[in-house]
Amino acid sequence: MGCGNSTAASTTPGPAESAKDVQDDSSMDEEKRRNYGGVYVGIPADLTNETAGQTASTHKE
């Protein structure tokens, strides 16, 4: 009995999870690109360079 339930349970959520993952990926991309009231949500590549520059300046002093 236990094996039958395990097999059925594993088969059912598989496809549902795959579809869910695809939707989540799209939603995440949209969330990153969205503009909330003029505030950009995301991490631009330039910001990484600025952070590195600030760290270097702080390290210098």
Curated annotation (Swiss-Prot):
Composition skew (Basic and acidic residues), residue ranges: 18-34
A Pfam family it matches: OCC1
Region of interest (Disordered), ranges: 1-61
Residue ranges of the TM segments: none
Record InterPro entries: OCC1
Biased composition range(s): Polar residues: 1-13, 48-61
Recorded family membership: Belongs to the OCC1 family.
Protein name (record): Overexpressed in colon carcinoma 1 protein homolog
Source organism of this protein record: Danio rerio
Record gene name: si:dkey-261e22.4
